[in-house]
Design a protein with these regions (language model features):
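Hydrophobic transmembrane alpha-helices and their immediate loop junctions
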Residues: 1-168
């Protein structure tokens, strides 16, 4: 327990971090730092809204804050949007494209992404419809990027979103 909540580190987190360091992939280390700042935004707003964190999990896909505190829908929105807001502010201050990408990704209307969770607070059905439309568009974009740029990055993100959005 750290600061009153559990810090859980999956082995996959250390494996990915080790590969990043070995391969000199500073961008992965940067991504983890920006993801940590993103989660710190959620955590800060959770504390401001009177909530208490249960755990922070580190894994191959980044960091995830878990909490069981019951908040009003408005406070929950503040908590959910605080993370992307951190990335937007970092982008505006430092013109770092990775923070812009994190902001855009987290503002997609797909559950379990932050903005998808905001929508689901108010309408489960709308959340599912917007999520499906967004996923179809993302699949098309991912295939295009794979064919034209030989880039697999969006494929991985889309697979993650499909797996988690259909389990909700």
């Amino acid at each position: 327990k750290l600061f009153g909540f559990y810090l859980i580190a999956d082995y996959s987190f250390f494996l990915m971090l080790s590969f990043a360091v070995l391969l000199g992939a500073e961008s992965i280390v940067d991504l983890l730092i920006y993801s940590a700042l993103h989660e710190l935004g959620h955590l800060s707003m959770l504390l401001i809204c009177g909530g208490r964190p249960d755990s922070l999990r580190l894994s191959y896909y980044g960091l995830a804050l878990k909490y069981s505190t019951q908040l009003s829908k408005i406070k929950e929105c503040f908590v959910l949007l605080a993370g992307p807001l951190v990335n937007l502010v970092l982008y505006l201050l430092f013109k770092n494209e990775m923070n812009l990408l994190l902001f855009v990704l987290n503002m997609l209307p797909v559950y379990p992404i932050d903005f998808g969770r905001v929508i689901s607070l108010f309408s489960y059905r709308l959340s599912k419809v917007l999520g499906c439309i967004t996923l179809v568009l993302l699949i098309a974009l991912a295939v295009y990027m794979l064919i034209v740029y030989k880039s697999f990055s969006l494929i991985f993100i889309v697979c993650y979103l499909i797996i988690y959005s259909f389990n909700y």
